[in-house]
């Protein structure tokens, strides 16, 4: 009986120490977990390129890589003491290792929050890391459509100028018709002008002769 009574306080003491140990561990995790969770590594990569997320894990531990969508984590890679296992996540292409993963052929949908969790041999959590990945879109390339637009604009300008010239040319027959030279060549126009000049000259001669004749008649009457 005495031995039972003596062992009872020892058991209680051990239990209390265990409770205090667990309490202190939870208290430390509660105090420092927000700091750890908010320690984010910012990484960026070009669309269509590759990006590597690097951790400080050693190769002799297990590592769990996952993607965080805001509500839940999705396992994408589990590296267990030298044995890599890649779990596809929406067609995610990557290489897996304890201290890093490489994501290939990045798309805009790959942007987001990623996490890495390292485990010791005993299975306890060793460290925890957050990554914020940003995939930069490709720069817009100049398409041939812009050149086509320029050509169309230039063609339009040339067409307008050509239409003006055509309009001026179309007015020429009307002006020539008003002057009496419709559908005539330059040689015909010169001949026509010469004939008009001869007719005018003959009319002037007739007028002069008639005036001279009238003057003679008036003198004979006197």
Curated annotation (Swiss-Prot):
The keyword Glycoprotein applies. It is a single-pass membrane protein. It comes from Human cytomegalovirus (strain Merlin) (HHV-5). The chain crosses the membrane at residues 193-213. GO terms for biological process: symbiont-mediated activation of host signal transduction pathway via agonism of host cell surface receptor; symbiont-mediated suppression of host dendritic cell mediated immune response. Belongs to the RL11 family. It is found in: Secreted; Host cell membrane. Keywords: Glycoprotein, Host cell membrane, Host membrane, Host-virus interaction, Membrane, Modulation of host dendritic cell activity by virus, Secreted, Transmembrane, Transmembrane helix, Viral immunoevasion. GO terms for cellular component: extracellular region; host cell plasma membrane; membrane. Gene3D superfamilies: Immunoglobulins. It comes from the Viruses. This is CEACAM1-like protein UL7. Plays a role in modulating the host immune response and affecting host cytokine production. Structurally and functionally homolog of host CEACAM1, induces endothelial cell angiogenesis. Highly glycosylated. The keyword rRNA-binding does not apply. Glycans are attached at residues 50, 56, 60, 71, 105, 109, 125, 132, 147, 164, 168, 189.
């Amino acid at each position: 009986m005495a031995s039972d009574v003596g062992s009872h306080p020892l058991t209680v003491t051990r239990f209390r120490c265990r409770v205090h140990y667990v309490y202190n561990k939870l208290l430390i995790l509660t105090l420092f977990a927000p700091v750890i969770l908010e320690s984010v590594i910012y990484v960026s990569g070009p669309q269509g390129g590759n990006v590597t997320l690097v951790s400080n894990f050693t190769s002799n531990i297990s590592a769990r890589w996952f993607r965080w969508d805001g509500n839940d984590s999705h396992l994408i890679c589990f590296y267990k003491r030298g044995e890599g296992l890649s779990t596809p996540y929406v067609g995610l292409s990557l290489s897996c290792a304890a201290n890093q993963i490489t994501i290939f052929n990045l798309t805009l949908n790959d942007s987001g929050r990623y996490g890495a969790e390292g485990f010791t041999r005993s299975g306890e959590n060793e460290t925890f890391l957050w990554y914020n990945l940003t995939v930069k879109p490709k720069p817009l390339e100049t398409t041939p459509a812009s050149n086509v637009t320029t050509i169309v604009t230039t063609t339009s300008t040339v067409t307008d100028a050509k239409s003006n010239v055509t309009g001026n040319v179309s007015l020429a027959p009307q002006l020539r018709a008003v002057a009496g030279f419709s559908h005539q060549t330059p040689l015909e126009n010169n001949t026509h002008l010469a004939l008009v000049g001869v007719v005018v000259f003959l009319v002037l001669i007739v007028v002069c002769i008639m005036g001279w004749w009238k003057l003679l008649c008036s003198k004979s009457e006197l």
